[in-house]
Amino acid sequence: PVSYVDISNDGIDDLIVDQGVQRCEKSWSIFAGGTGGNNFIFFINPTIDNVKAWDGSGFGGDKENKIFSMLIRSYEIVKWKSKNALKVQVHGVSCNVSGAIGCYNILVASEKGIKKVEGPTPNPQ
């Protein structure tokens, strides 16, 4: 799915694309991901120009156009220091627990990028 939510806390909705739900006729598994999750793309303060600048064949994003990409299992919007932040679920290898337990990181977004402010922390068992 595609979500619009202000994760950069500047009053402008940002665009989040979960590539795990995309399909390709010639390769059904290309977007399927794995135990570590799948690719999510974050467009900070998107405009028509920077959305059009996105190159789907690239990996890692495009900082100049405020496009950031990461491999995660899922995300939710949480409050961190009274502002919107991302709580992202990642594979357990990030915090020395099993993949099934997994970990989370807290990230804050701005036009400069997405920065980890907490984690990785093992999920409660």
What does each model-found stretch correspond to?
Residues I7-G20, K81-H91:
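Acidic/hydrophobic-patterned starts of short beta strands in beta-sheet-rich repeat architectures
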Residues Y4-D10, A32-G33:
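Short secondary-structure boundary/capping segments within folded domains
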Residues G60:
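Surface loop/turn signatures of beta-propeller and other carbohydrate-active proteins
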